[in-house]
Amino acid sequence: MSENSTASHAAAMAAFKSLANNNTSSSSIPSSYKIPTSAESAKIRSPTPLNSNAAVPQNRPKRAATSVGVKSTTKPMAKSIATPISVKPSKANGFVSGVNKQRAPLPLARADSSLKSSRRYPQSKGLQASSSSSTMPKDMINSVKQSIESKSVGKDPSQKRISSLYEPQEMLKNLRSSISAKTVSGTSVRPMISEKNQAMINGIRDRIDSKRIVTDVSKTSSLSSEDVSHLQGHDLANTHTYQPLNNNDSFSSFGSSFSEVEPSSLSKANGEEDEESIIDNASATVQEHPPVNEEVAKNMNMDKTPKAKPKRRPPPDLVSGPREETSIPMFHDKSVESLPDGYSSTDADITLENDRNSSQSKFPQFPDIKKHKKTEKKGNFLKKYSRPLKCVDNEVNLLDSDEAEEEDETDSSYGKRAPQILTPPTQQVRLKSTMRKTNRRKEKKYMFNENKPWKNHNELSSISEQERKRYEGLWASNKGNYMNSVVTRLVGVDYDSGKSEPEVEEEEDSRKAARLSSKAGTFDSGKMSDQENFHGLLSVEVDQLIHGVVVRRIWKRSRLPRETLEAIWNLVDFRKDGTLNKPEFVVGMWLVDQCLYGRKLPKKVENEVWDSLGSIGLNVVVRKKGKR
């Protein structure tokens, strides 16, 4: 045992010395420490995991007997030098990943670690090619610097947008020097004009030149020297004297307005320009204008004021006829250049004088609105298919505007219509008493309901047949009670019916006339007699009366206040003897029921209530059909 341990220790020391010497060649390195090839290095760098399903490589390089993962054939050293480590084997896919390992000696372990750190595996051919093709970091830094320098602004101050002198004093000095240089040279810095801008300026110049020449030479050649001198001597500043001549309020259909000659509508500046243009055109030569300055051409659109568009002329059929007799109308805001041929500037004074003499002259209108009115057709359609309105004359069209009325007043010599006169309405105006329509359902709905009498007020001033029969039954059961015990004399009762009639003495005519005159009243005697007979004031039987005591006991059952019952008694008591006859008792009972319904007592019982009792005393039996 001791010999084997010494032999292994000697072998380990020899290996350690060989590793310590770096000058040894590759041939002196044992076969277990040879550098693997590229294929083997790739396998070593990317080992398969233990838990993966990949197969275990068969050509795995074998290490020396002293490596940790392989069991050494030699016997272990003493316990103080190396102690065995027991590791439980773990099987994964049939591969034993753990074996009994022995701890190597300390110098041998250090030599093995230094060897692993100094070991460099060569790269494959593909990796060497890629690394050789890529640039070094210095080259990359140089390329970045070159790109930055190419994009940077040069040192020339003309290329820089911001001055390098940021101090205010130096900036002011540079500004003053530049201003002084410009003033000395006398030239202003103008921006460079591109071809497109130059073409636009040339187009503006051409348009201005074309607008200055409006009329042909042939039109203005008819002007004589006298006309030109008259135009030069004409003063447009004193045109305010002709302002009241504008009395025409008519308008044409296409927006332009005819009016008499109104020099006041032309400004002085426009008039001067027109005179100059006429004089220039009279010379029959077109003057060439000098080139326009660039700044003037730029500001031409800003200074140009909007002018009125040239308006349409009237058609030739209306102008060609009475052209020589009538004055030529002028449009508002219109220059002399747009006037027709053969017109001279002296015609304006002639027309002004004629207008002073005849202020009623009116100009013809175009088109004739009276002949082409669409509202008339619409009016005829309404007349045919619509009802005529009351209090409105159907011949008058209410849809015409105020302008049409003004046009009728300002009719020309071409045609005049007689003024239309409003005719009075043929039928008398009848107003409806109400706009509501009668509905039978509503009438049936609002009929009197005895269970809800407060909802209807129909027939409140009359006693119904049903109510009258009920009150008469109550009177029949209580009439004549306690009448034999009455001590006072009753009105209309004949107490002397059993005694002999007194003899009638003859009276003189004078006494008889005096007695009749004293009894004569303001009321009609027939009317008074009917009322007396109705209330039983002249003649009545005792059995047909009801005592006041009985009436009080009956009315008290209604539980109305005593004052209300007293007011009802006063309304129906015409006898003034403490009794009531049949009509008075029935009306009193009806008033009690009305108070129970919530109606207020009237100040006087109306005659309609008394008239509703006209059939009292008639016993008529009404039989229905089919019954015998």
Curated annotation (Swiss-Prot):
Residues 322-336 have a biased composition (Basic and acidic residues). Residues 370-380 have a biased composition (Basic residues). Keywords: Lipid metabolism. This is Increased rDNA silencing protein 4. It comes from Scheffersomyces stipitis (strain ATCC 58785 / CBS 6054 / NBRC 10063 / NRRL Y-11545). InterPro entries: EF-hand-dom_pair, EH_dom. Residues 21-38, 253-267 have a biased composition (Low complexity). Gene3D superfamilies: EF-hand. Residues 21-83, 107-138, 253-276, 297-380, 398-421, 497-527 are annotated as: Disordered. PROSITE patterns: EH. One of its GO terms (biological process) is lipid metabolic process. Signal peptide: none annotated. Residues 527-616 form the EH domain. Belongs to the IRS4 family. Residues 400-411 have a biased composition (Acidic residues). It comes from the Eukaryota. The gene is IRS4. Transmembrane segments: none annotated. Positive regulator of phosphatidylinositol 4,5-bisphosphate turnover and negatively regulates signaling through the cell integrity pathway. Involved in rDNA silencing. One of its GO terms (cellular component) is plasma membrane.
